[in-house]
């Protein structure tokens, strides 16, 4: 393709182009948690610790409606599990929006965050360890250990991606996925919604599991990038593959069609490798629930676009 490589997005290059996402259908059903009101009634009290004044906290809750997103993302857990997952989701959005995306922090911030004994924790450093302790109370130790590792990996990746503008318009979807894999957040989300399930390393290291999980992430990446494109159109970073593809093709419409085409392929791959995985380990009850949980999460993630203010 004959075009100059871009490291930032300029919406003025695409003025008057229509944003219309082609229709697609997921084969998995979404559900909603019966505990959604329990969290929504407590959300304001929870998030105010991260803001300098109460009005800012109120504005954040109204603008984002994370409670609605949580109800769709985590519909299968018991109340204790749902509450900690919902708090973590709020925590991640606020940490990313106000800390990591500010580009004012280096990795030493994460070093301090992950040091439980640090005497210089900010509200995020204090809260993340309270959340981890809560996960240990309701989840499986090995799965919570994995969640903590995934959180640290996500944090370091998010700081690097936001600060150093490593993404550019020359990337293929595979290159883009490899660049965004850490900061996108699907790994930590998968760890949080499956913290009560135990899937052994032997299974996680198998070819079929790695393929299944890769396509689960790719599927959600395309759902995210198509669903959030309109919201992110004013942001200059190329942390959205629709932007990357639009620069390559000179058209937002063609880029959206391309990304939905990828999504449809990834949906088929998720089902293909989940079937192979269940056939490979037919007597593993946690594995079947793990797969079902991630498919249900994906359906809820998709439903969240157009349902909560954050994505409108």
From Swiss-Prot:
EC number: 4.2.3.-
Catalysis performed (reactions): (2E,6E)-farnesyl diphosphate + H2O = discoidol + diphosphate
Placement of sequence motif DDxx(x)D/E motif: 96-101
Renumbered ranges of motif NDxxSxxxD/E motif: 224-232
Record key words, sorted: Lyase, Metal-binding
Source organism, top-level taxon: Eukaryota
Induction line: Expression is almost undetectable in vegetatively growing cells. Small amounts of transcripts accumulate between 4-8 hrs of development, continue to accumulate until they peak at 16 hrs, and decline thereafter.
Pathway where it operates: Sesquiterpene biosynthesis
Enzyme class, spelled out: lyase
Observed phenotype of the null mutant: Impairs the production of discoidol and discodiene, and leads to delayed multicellular development.
GO MF annotation terms: metal ion binding; sesquiterpene synthase activity
Pfam family for this entry, one: Terpene_syn_C_2
Family: Belongs to the terpene synthase family.
Role of this protein: Terpene synthase; part of the gene cluster that mediates the biosynthesis of the trisnorsesquiterpene discodiene which has a function during later stages of multicellular development, during the transition from fingers to Mexican hats. The terpene synthase tps8 converts its substrate farnesyl diphosphate (FDP) into the bicyclic sesquiterpene alcohol discoidol. The cytochrome P450 monooxygenase cyp521A1 then catalyzes the oxidative degradation of discoidol to form the trisnorsesquiterpene discodiene.
Domain notes for this protein: Contains several highly conserved motifs that are important for catalytic activity including the aspartate-rich 'DDxx(x)D/E' motif and the 'NDxxSxxxD/E' motif, both of which are involved in complexing metal ions to coordinate the binding of the isoprenyl diphosphate substrate in the active site.
Protein name per the record: Terpene synthase 8
């Amino acid at each position: 393709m004959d075009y100059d490589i871009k490291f930032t997005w300029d919406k003025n290059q695409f003025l008057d182009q229509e944003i219309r996402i082609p229709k697609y259908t997921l084969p998995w059903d979404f559900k909603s948690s019966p505990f959604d009101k329990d969290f929504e009634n407590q959300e304001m009290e929870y998030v105010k610790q991260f803001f300098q004044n109460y009005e800012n906290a109120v504005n954040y809750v109204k603008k984002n409606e994370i409670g609605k997103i949580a109800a769709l993302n985590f519909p299968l857990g018991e109340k204790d599990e749902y509450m900690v997952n919902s708090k973590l989701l709020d925590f991640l959005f606020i940490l990313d929006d106000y800390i990591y995306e500010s580009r004012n922090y280096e990795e030493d911030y994460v070093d301090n965050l992950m040091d439980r004994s640090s005497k210089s924790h900010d509200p995020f450093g204090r809260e993340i360890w309270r959340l981890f302790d809560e996960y240990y109370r309701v989840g499986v130790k090995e799965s919570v250990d994995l969640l903590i590792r995934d959180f640290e990996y996500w944090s370091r990746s998010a700081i690097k991606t936001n600060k150093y503008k490593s993404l550019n318009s020359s990337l293929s979807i595979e290159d883009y996925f490899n660049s965004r894999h850490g900061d996108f957040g699907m790994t930590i989300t998968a760890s949080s919604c499956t913290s009560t399930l135990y899937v052994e390393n032997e299974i996680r290291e198998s070819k079929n599991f790695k393929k299944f999980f890769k396509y689960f992430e790719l599927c959600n990446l395309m759902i995210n990038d198509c669903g959030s494109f309109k919201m992110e159109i004013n942001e200059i970073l190329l942390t959205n593959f629709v932007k990357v593809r639009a620069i390559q093709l000179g058209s937002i419409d063609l880029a959206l069609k391309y990304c939905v085409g990828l999504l449809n392929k990834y949906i088929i791959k998720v089902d293909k490798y989940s079937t192979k995985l269940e056939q490979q380990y037919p007597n593993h009850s946690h594995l079947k629930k793990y797969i079902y949980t991630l498919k249900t999460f994906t359906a809820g993630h998709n439903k969240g676009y157009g349902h909560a203010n954050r994505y409108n």
